[in-house]
Design a protein with these regions (language model features):
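Structural preference for solvent-exposed beta-strand-turn elements
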Residues: 1-198
């Protein structure tokens, strides 16, 4: 087989290699849409929704994140069938209407690569998505499936709305979560006028 030799100072390493022809070749992306936005904006969209992705669901289309443009808004949506997270932002430039599902591993890798400064260019093809971040080009396959119609489960005109101090509610949920167990994972919310009991 092929070998590669590495030399550094007085050290010498000979390593066996695999045939380069076996390395998967990603076809040239047949671009359907490209958009450029701030890395911080894309990172925020991913950070706010990634926790709701399924991990090993038989409904394979849930093991990723919906990346959607409707011409005016850019939206990320994730659900595992029990919870749903959605985050959106105004599009920096006008774009076409498109929905693609990026696999969980691709989303997590993108989060790792994205910084807080500079821009990222997202190119969407029929089977792949590509992110150009500085001199790094990241390409991921897309999940071939139909994401659930998430808009049907989000109330358009909710009958009741709760307004609470975010940190106070978070602290209360963390305290009650201590008593949640494998059998009963839920936390019951009891609403009364001007009070919420967990």
């Amino acid at each position: 087989g092929e070998r590669v030799t590495l030399k550094a100072g007085r050290s010498r390493f000979v390593l066996a290699t695999l045939p380069a022809t076996d390395f998967p070749v990603i076809d040239e992306l047949a671009q359907q849409q490209a958009l450029t936005l701030a890395q911080a904006d894309l990172r925020r969209l991913l950070d706010k929704t990634h926790f709701s992705m399924a991990q090993q669901d038989v409904r394979y289309y849930l093991n990723g994140m919906l990346f959607e443009t409707d011409g005016k808004m850019l939206r990320t949506v994730a659900t595992d069938g029990h919870r749903l997270a959605l985050c959106e932002m105004d599009m920096p430039t006008k774009s076409g209407v498109q929905q693609v599902i990026i696999p969980r591993k691709g989303v997590l890798e993108l989060q790792r690569l994205l910084g807080t400064e500079g821009e990222v260019t997202i190119t969407i093809g029929s089977n792949h998505v590509r992110a150009q971040i500085g001199d790094v080009r990241f390409t991921s396959k897309l999940i071939d499936g139909r994401f659930p119609e998430y808009s049907r489960v989000i109330p358009s005109a909710p009958q009741k709305a709760i307004v609470a101090d975010r940190e106070v509610l978070r602290a209360a949920l963390q305290r009650t979560a201590i008593l949640a167990n494998e059998k009963y994972r839920g936390i019951r919310l009891a609403l009364k006028k001007n009070s919420l009991t967990l």
